[in-house]
Amino acid sequence: MSKDDVIQMAGEVVENLPNAMFRVKLENGHVFLGHISGKMRMHYIRILPGDKVTVEMTPYDLTRARIIFRAK
């Protein structure tokens, strides 16, 4: 899968879950499971409920996504 296949969207973290997983709500109301990308783990970027984030979703599984950016 190339990087052109991913879908980027903006959302808000609703809930922290174990193992660095988060419940994220998109602007259109869709709620799904998100995990932190590797670079965010490497740089110890913390995510809390209420944070605005950018997520990447694959067209194959729209119930999970990778959190790639946390807005300030």
Curated annotation (Swiss-Prot):
GO CC annotation, single: cytosol
| Cell compartment(s), UniProt | Cytoplasm
Q: Which UniProt keywords apply?
A: Cytoplasm, Initiation factor, Protein biosynthesis, RNA-binding, rRNA-binding
Q: Identify one Pfam family in the record.
A: eIF-1a
Give a short account of what the protein does.
Answer: One of the essential components for the initiation of protein synthesis. Stabilizes the binding of IF-2 and IF-3 on the 30S subunit to which N-formylmethionyl-tRNA(fMet) subsequently binds. Helps modulate mRNA selection, yielding the 30S pre-initiation complex (PIC). Upon addition of the 50S ribosomal subunit IF-1, IF-2 and IF-3 are released leaving the mature 70S translation initiation complex.
Q: How does it assemble?
A: Component of the 30S ribosomal translation pre-initiation complex which assembles on the 30S ribosome in the order IF-2 and IF-3, IF-1 and N-formylmethionyl-tRNA(fMet); mRNA recruitment can occur at any time during PIC assembly.
| Protein name, as recorded | Translation initiation factor IF-1 1
Q: Which organism is it from?
A: Polynucleobacter asymbioticus (strain DSM 18221 / CIP 109841 / QLW-P1DMWA-1) (Polynucleobacter necessarius subsp. asymbioticus)
Gene label: infA1
